[in-house]
Amino acid sequence: IDKALSDSAVDYLAVIFDKAEKTFRNEIYPDYKAHRPDAPEELVPQFPMVREATRAMGLPCLELDDYEADDIIASYAMAASRAGIAVTVVSSDKDLMQLVGASADGVKIEMYDPMKDKPIGPAEVMEKFGVGPEKVVDVQALAGDSVDNVPGVPGIGVKTAAELINTYGDLETLLAHAGEIKQPKRRETL
């Protein structure tokens, strides 16, 4: 937060938190994040202190019932971009990489990884997922996400998912042409 506040180019800043409750995703898929371990016991009492410190710094501290921080971040980022405001999402969360380069009214959304102290651009997204940011959701739909306990298509990981999406363009087209896939098992599975 200090780094963002010391950057003279920052006009707006919000700190967005997850609530420790289940989200609308759990209603759709009850096993969502079912195997994720609880936060370390010594960390839990610090959460309210971080929120309090954030507010003491005069920063908006946002969290919503039924939504993850990712959902709120994406909504605010797109709304700000539509309003012509340059956006930098500060996070190392791979799920937010789909926002990189998204543009509304010509204002692109950028991402910065504070853990690695480096920006995340389309090249970094391509390196991680094998596709551009706009296709990350398609790759995740095929490969699943073990961190969130979201199953993918059996036998298809990120590399194969990226290969398929790059070949067919998007998930919808891939599924429409699944019968054309050369590998029998993959064709059958899809």
Report residues per predicted region.
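Non-catalytic, usually N-terminal nucleic-acid engagement modules in DNA/RNA processing proteins
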Residues: 1-14, 18, 24-27, 31
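Short, active-site-adjacent cap segments at secondary-structure transitions
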Residues: 21-25, 95-98
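Extended two-metal-dependent nuclease catalytic cores across DNA- and RNA-processing enzymes
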Residues: 34-190
